[in-house]
């Protein structure tokens, strides 16, 4: 049996591979058509102009669904391993909410481009990266709470390093983007897709985009740490019938006679 066939380990694997493919395909399309600069564009800029925005939106919507599934499975796994630990239960529920909000933000970023609906796009980015960072932080705390009884210390340390990586990237992106978009460099900078080294704010722009890509990579790394955990869990859907028919009320008896849809004489 292959490693991705064990339990539900294919979920985080598929999430990372699919999302990375969405970024790569839209990036290649955007630079081939000269819609963005090849050196560190914003991730969402590679999905701003047609046709790549269609690919970007469709693939990230699927990525959001995979992310919801991954976050839910993680929630169920932690709950099953710690059914009576109140502190862990509260943190686990908080992590579920934060993760789902991050998935919602990912879908908003994918479908509302900054050149069309800037406010909605920024709201989606805040949900994706902000709630996503908090989700990683909560899951790292849970990993600390569950070691060494549930898993080894290595998992906690790896996730802690990834959270620190994410935090440094988030701080850099937030600081530089705040300076870049405070109005000092012009109002049209929001719609700007092409940058030259001579442009005002170029350095801040490059730091912001580099931090955004770095933050995304930290997300990928964090979800990859779920692979080993998910090899040890499976979920199943069980159908429970609340009656033997689909009538709202009991049907009237017809003396074992059946009404034909078409007359036999036809």
From Swiss-Prot:
Pfam families: Frag1. Belongs to the DRAM/TMEM150 family. It is a multi-pass membrane protein. GO terms for biological process: apoptotic process; autophagy; photoreceptor cell maintenance; regulation of autophagy; visual perception. It comes from Bos taurus. Keywords: Apoptosis, Autophagy, Cell membrane, Lysosome, Membrane, Transmembrane, Transmembrane helix. Plays a role in the initiation of autophagy. In the retina, might be involved in the process of photoreceptor cells renewal and recycling to preserve visual function. Induces apoptotic cell death when coexpressed with DRAM1. GO terms for cellular component: apical plasma membrane; lysosomal membrane; lysosome; photoreceptor inner segment. InterPro entries: DRAM/TMEM150_Autophagy_Mod, Frag1/DRAM/Sfk1. This is DNA damage-regulated autophagy modulator protein 2. The keyword Membrane applies. It comes from the Eukaryota. The lineage of its organism: Eukaryota, Metazoa, Chordata, Craniata, Vertebrata. The keyword Ribosomal protein does not apply. The chain crosses the membrane at residues 8-28, 53-73, 92-112, 117-137, 160-180, 207-227. It is found in: Lysosome membrane; Photoreceptor inner segment; Apical cell membrane.
């Amino acid at each position: 049996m292959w490693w991705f066939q064990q339990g539900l380990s294919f979920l985080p694997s598929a999430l990372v591979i699919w999302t990375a493919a969405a970024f790569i395909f839209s990036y290649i399309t955007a630079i081939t058509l000269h819609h963005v600069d090849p050196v560190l564009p914003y991730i969402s800029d590679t999905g701003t102009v047609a046709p790549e925005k269609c690919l970007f939106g469709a693939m990230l919507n699927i990525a959001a669904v995979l992310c919801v599934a991954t976050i839910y499975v993680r929630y169920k796994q932690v709950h099953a391993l710690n059914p009576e630990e109140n502190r862990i239960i509260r943190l686990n529920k908080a992590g579920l909410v934060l993760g789902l909000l991050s998935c919602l933000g990912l879908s908003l970023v994918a479908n509302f481009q900054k050149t069309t609906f800037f406010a909605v796009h920024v709201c989606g980015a805040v949900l994706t990266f902000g709630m996503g960072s908090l989700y990683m932080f909560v899951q790292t705390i849970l990993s600390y709470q569950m070691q060494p009884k549930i898993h080894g210390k290595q998992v906690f340390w790896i996730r802690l390093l990834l959270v620190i990586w994410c935090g440094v990237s988030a701080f850099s992106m937030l600081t530089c983007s705040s300076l870049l978009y405070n109005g000092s460099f012009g109002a049209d900078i929001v719609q700007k897709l092409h940058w030259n080294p001579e442009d005002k704010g170029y350095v801040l722009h490059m730091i912001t985009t580099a931090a955004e890509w770095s933050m995304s990579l930290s997300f990928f790394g964090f979800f990859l740490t779920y692979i080993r955990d998910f090899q040890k869990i499976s979920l199943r859907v069980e159908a429970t019938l609340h009656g033997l028919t689909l009538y709202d009320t009991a049907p009237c008896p017809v003396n074992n006679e059946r009404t034909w849809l078409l007359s036999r004489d036809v």
